[in-house]
Amino acid sequence: MTQEEISGISQDENNLIAERRSKLTALRQTGNAFPNDYRRDNLARILHEKYDSCSREELESSQVTVKVAGRMLFKRVMGKASFATIQDMSGRIQLYISNDHTGETAHEAFRHYDLGDILGAEGVLFKTRTDELSLRVTQLHLLTKSLRPLPEKFHGLADQEQKYRRRYLDLITNEDTRRVFAIRSKIIQAIREFLVDRDYLEVETPMMHSIPGGATARPFVTHHNALDMSLYLRIAPELYLKRLVVGGMEKVFEINRNFRNEGISTRHNPEFTMLEFYEAYQDHNYLMDLTESMLREVALKVSGTTRIVYQQREMDLAQPFARLTIAQAILKYHPEYSDAQLNDRDFLTKALQAKGVTVNPDSGIGGLQLALFDETTEHLLFEPVFIVDYPAEVSPLARCNDANPEITDRFELYIAGREIANGFSELNDPEDQANRFLEQARAKEAGDLEAMHYDADYIQALEYGLPPTAGEGIGIDRLVMLLTDSPSIRDVILFPQLRKED
């Protein structure tokens, strides 16, 4: 008995590719090398669910005939009979190919098939002596000839970067990767259902903006040839969604891509997926409650539990999320600071400079506190916590607090040491918004590349009247990281941005 595992051990890969191309040439000479007339009627997972519990005798008596298709991952040739395992979108199933049932000609052809080839198989279900559900093949079809050998031993790609560059190979060989992206799809579907059930309307807004807005970030710039004008890939859909609220669409949401021309890290990808949703006649406190409910419901639908293990630490989303100001969070995790120090501009400036942080001379106390929070505390926030009362100077689109105009009715949600969501009561005073845009424009002129542009059309929309509104953005990729226990954002984006290969 001989056993073929993965090619590429004893021969150079180029020789293997040449050998497979030779087989493809022979196939072309005999007819259609890439047929498209085979139709399966079952998936591996469904067959296992239906028939794994059946005995050998039950299967033999019922003579269940099925048609399956998938990529061949294992192949074992033994004289007058052979075994193979194929993988489809749902799982794997074993094939039994023999002279008696499949025919000598088809069995002989199978001997020359390679791992990675895509097969269609028709036959009768049975169980082997080891009780493995298998298909006794009566007809075998080579649907696609694979010209390149798969990674050795199907242990997946050893090089992490190659997993990202050649995600198709990672998906073929790594069940965990397939699981992550199946969960991602379920998360997005669960979010949609949560919002639609509450009468939110899903909308689509432009991906190319004449003026970048809705966030403080550097945009990607492109050019429209026919209009001879610069356009920006959107950094956020916020200003368009609020235009819709002005127009009477009082509960809207969008799940789509944002683009920011900034750094790449385990938490950042230049192209990422964001949920943004807006509701008229509500405020930021309502949004915090709604967000807690949303995350619990999504976790239950996706995982069946609100208990999450992330990087070997456990949390329970069923517990109430804490709410802390920026200063309270710093003091909780850094008792070496005092409240007086956190309200001392000179102290904050020196503390930040000591940590190598460049201090903006125009920053107020709130901005300096936030910089210290980002540097010292953000990464320590494992349990879900809403950080509230963001300073007005860093919140150009948020409504100022009625009792203290130095802060805004804004929050950010942190889980597992990273920001998951950002929301606030929306600024709907057009004159206040215009003044804040002017401040941002001055900052941009002074060299702040992330400052916002002045958007006159948005101001005009506000002048028609934006009702009291609350809005929020949730980073889908980071939420998927949390619910799949993935350490890097690249693990949850099918094709993350990477440097160009040499």
UniProtKB/Swiss-Prot annotation:
It comes from the Bacteria. It comes from Nitrosomonas europaea (strain ATCC 19718 / CIP 103999 / KCTC 2705 / NBRC 14298). Its cofactor is Mg(2+). One of its GO terms (cellular component) is cytosol. This is Lysine--tRNA ligase. Binds 3 Mg(2+) ions per subunit. Its main location: cytoplasm. It catalyses: tRNA(Lys) + L-lysine + ATP = L-lysyl-tRNA(Lys) + AMP + diphosphate. PANTHER family: LYSINE--TRNA LIGASE, CHLOROPLASTIC_MITOCHONDRIAL, LYSYL-TRNA SYNTHETASE. It holds the Pfam family tRNA_anti-codon. CDD domains: LysRS_core (cd00775), LysRS_N (cd04322). It is found in: Cytoplasm. Belongs to the class-II aminoacyl-tRNA synthetase family. It is an enzyme of class 6 (ligase). GO terms for molecular function: ATP binding; lysine-tRNA ligase activity; magnesium ion binding; tRNA binding. HAMAP family: Lys_tRNA_synth_class2.
